[in-house]
Amino acid sequence: MRSKLAATVGAVAVTLVAAAPALGHGRSPDLAFRGQAIVPTGTMFDGTTVGGLSSITYDARRDRYYAISDDQGQLQPARFYTLALAVRDGRLSDADVRLQDVTTLLAPNGLPYPKASLDPEGLVLTKDRKLVYTSEGLPGSGIDPFVRRAALDGSFRGEFPVPEAFRVAGTPASGVRPNLGFESAGVTHDGRYLFTASENALYQDGPAATITNGSPARILRYSLKTGRVDRQYVYVTDKVAEPPVPDTAFSVNGLVELLPLDDDTLIAMERSFSVGAPGTGNTIKLYTVELRGHTAVKTPLLDLDVLGIPLDNVEGMTFGPRLRHGRRSLVLVSDNNFAANQFTQFLLFAVGK
């Protein structure tokens, strides 16, 4: 069955199609796996609990990475970590990860965010050396998602307007679903555009992903010149990869990261999890995405199951430095949910031949 919903945001008309994903045959980059590093759950740094790393971005000037924690202030205030990853030799192991700093994100009033006032998820460094970070919002508490800017010291530096369709409303339900809002953040190399997306469909756009159907998420493209959304795209996720056990247990699949290759081409990451599924229950897939009209057309790039290693809840992705033989690096990171049976995982890939 095929259903169409029309939504207008400002002057932008978007047709949302709850159907099979739009699959393309575009040219995708070659990826070669070069190793992993594990940071155990419970690791402490400078008085904070290291974990929940849901997004990562690379600072080429400093050869450092920034990774945001999705702690809502339950353990410590909202924050991001500065890390060094020794990857230029084309390998990654546990000893190659060094935590260097932790920075508290500050609310517009200049103070740390109050507990349970945001759900920090996406993070990206822009050309003007500001950070953009996203919050999924907390629909159960009536808190809207947001997209904000911060200086590298964590201080508030502005906010991008969020289209009304994403805002939380109760009757009838509309806007982002709980834990299915703005999980991603990516900026084009030329600094013109910022991308983020809902992880699944907005309430008014269709169902969340299940073991039988995908979900029509919305990708937003912001012009960094105007600070406003100038285009929206429909991205239909895959269905949940594995049935949960029992079949009434929790399961999810969603669009968790976007990494621009150019103005119209992205790498998208989907993460599926099912309670009771084999192994860790996680399935992570990468797609090359071409933006055509208002549709995101997916081409399979990599199913991380082929790596043959246990996968945690991988949600973050960034390009890093050139490796020793000239290939560009790609780094992925997992959000361990601060759970004792999970782990923070960094994965290294070489891009190109």
Task: Annotate each language-model stretch with its function.
Residues 1-24:
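Secretory targeting and sorting signals
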